[in-house]
Amino acid sequence: MQRRRGRTERARKRRRRSSGSRAVNESYRSEFIELRKWLKERKFEDTDLVPASFPGTGRGLMSKASLQEGQVMISLPESCLLTTDTVIRSSLGPYIKKWKPPVSPLLALCTFLVSEKHAGCRSLWKSYLDILPKSYTCPVCLEPEVVDLLPSPLKAKAEEQRARVQDLFTSARGFFSTLQPLFAEPVDSVFSYRAFLWAWCTVNTRAVYLRSRRQECLSAEPDTCALAPFLDLLNHSPHVQVKAAFNEKTRCYEIRTASRCRKHQEVFICYGPHDNQRLLLEYGFVSVRNPHACVPVSADMLVKFLPAADKQLHRKITILKDHGFTGNLTFGWDGPSWRLLTALKLLCLEAERFTSWKKVLLGEVISDTNEKTSLGVAQKICSDVIEETHAVLRKVSDMKEGTVSLRSQLSLVEALRMEELRILQASAEILSGLLAPFS
């Protein structure tokens, strides 16, 4: 007779089955113990959130108890926030006040981070600095041969980002030289490009929005960035909603959940309704099954499959430019966007119906021929981008085999391209369905 399994055995089986997907509590690690002490000294009250390692998202925060909708999950006192006010009150303050033209709020924060990182054990912010990433995966940090594998729109933005950071560093070297009295080592070795890039990425990827009072000694650029220790361990999910703001009454930066979260689950915040190219550019990661993910279509790709003999093509392109229809043209999980199809419908207008272009922009159907032709062009564009994506993925696979040092960077590109491939395949299927009635 077969023995019946009891509750204990069933529970054991469930634990074994889920052991590979469970979070690992990391609150026992020395760096997090020190961070807790540091936060407590600054009046931070303990929360039901603890650092943990999660499969898929890496390090994040886990809830020790169920969170209810509307509950404050983190309340970080002003004394824990790293702002430009922190910088001005530090030993850097007198030098910043003297420098002309005034440094920007961003440069002030970056300078402080480099200085405090260099100070090591002498830094009052050591407990926070120790839990920050040693390196980042934003495109500005990627090797040129890896950046070349990014989709064209993202590659262009990545190159702009790199140039912007390099320009900021170069223009700041004169200011850095005035800080020599603060350091025993040559200031050039302290404020290296590598150290500055780390600081810039720290601010760019981890800062929360906090409008600070205007500092007269800083430039007029918006002063809206604050680093928030512990709070910045929260990972992004496009599927959650939270309310984050500075509470003027409590003088705390608060995050309030807008949905429930079960005990021992990872707690997320949402950085915004960003697509994956934006997430990779600004934060250095890709979100799987991101509902906001899309594949952009360039203006050049729009006309690639149109008949070269169309005498009205130049006029059509001008109309699209004048009415803002040459940007934000995308394929998404639900197929080609309305803007993409509208642009293609106008480009595919027959000569005798060209005068109806205003109706096209208003979303009106002009003719079955126009509908079929524009959908056909969309299908060709989609197929072309699918082929290109497959080719890049093959190249990434080959490079991962031959260049071990670049594997982590290549895996990031692979994740982006794979997600975009899934979107394109979903769009291709939808386009086939839309074209079926015309066949």
From Swiss-Prot:
| GO function term, MF aspect, one | histone H4K20me methyltransferase activity
Any one Pfam family match given in the protein's UniProt record, by short name: SET
UniProt entry keywords in alphabetical sequence = Cytoplasm, Inflammatory response, Methyltransferase, Nucleus, S-adenosyl-L-methionine, Transferase
Q: Which domain of life is it from?
A: Eukaryota
Annotated region (Disordered), positions in chain: 1-25
| InterPro entries (UniProt xref) | Rubisco_LSMT_subst-bd, Rubisco_LSMT_subst-bd_sf, SET_dom, SET_dom_sf, SET_MeTrfase, SETD3_SETD6_MTase, SETD4_SET
Q: Name one GO cellular component term.
A: nucleus
Compartments in which it is found: Cytoplasm, Cytosol; Nucleus
**EC class of this enzyme?**
transferase
Any single biological process term in GO: positive regulation of tumor necrosis factor production
Say what happens when this gene is deleted: No visible phenotype in normal physiological conditions. Increased proliferation of bone marrow mesenchymal stem cells (BMSCs), impaired BMSCs migration and differentiation potentials of lineages of cardiacmyocyte and smooth muscle cell. Conditional deletion in adult mice improves the survival from radiation-induced hematopoietic failure and thymic lymphoma. Extends survival from radiation-induced thymic lymphoma is likely due to slower tumor enlargement in the thymus.
Q: Which SUPFAM superfamilies match?
A: SET domain (SSF82199)
List where Basic residues composition bias occurs.
1-19
Tissue-specificity statement:
Expressed in the forebrain subventricular zone, in quiescent neural stem cells.
Annotated SET domain ranges read 47-272
Q: Kindly state which reaction or reactions the protein catalyses.
A: L-lysyl(4)-[histone H3] + S-adenosyl-L-methionine = N(6)-methyl-L-lysyl(4)-[histone H3] + S-adenosyl-L-homocysteine + H(+); N(6)-methyl-L-lysyl(4)-[histone H3] + S-adenosyl-L-methionine = N(6),N(6)-dimethyl-L-lysyl(4)-[histone H3] + S-adenosyl-L-homocysteine + H(+); L-lysyl(20)-[histone H4] + S-adenosyl-L-methionine = N(6)-methyl-L-lysyl(20)-[histone H4] + S-adenosyl-L-homocysteine + H(+); N(6)-methyl-L-lysyl(20)-[histone H4] + S-adenosyl-L-methionine = N(6),N(6)-dimethyl-L-lysyl(20)-[histone H4] + S-adenosyl-L-homocysteine + H(+)
Residues that bind S-adenosyl-L-methionine: 271
> What Enzyme Commission number(s) apply to this enzyme?
2.1.1.-, 2.1.1.364
Q: What does this protein do?
A: Protein-lysine N-methyltransferase that methylates both histones and non-histone proteins. Via its catalytic activity, regulates many processes, including cell proliferation, cell differentiation, inflammatory response and apoptosis. Regulates the inflammatory response by mediating mono- and dimethylation of 'Lys-4' of histone H3 (H3K4me1 and H3K4me2, respectively), leading to activate the transcription of pro-inflammatory cytokines IL6 and TNF-alpha.
The UniProt similarity line reads: Belongs to the class V-like SAM-binding methyltransferase superfamily. SETD4 family.
**Record's subunit section:** Forms a ternary complex with TBK1 and ZNF268; the interaction with TBK1 is ZNF268-dependent and leads to TBK1 monomethylation.
Q: Please identify the protein, giving its name as recorded.
A: SET domain-containing protein 4
**Annotated source species:** Mus musculus (Mouse)
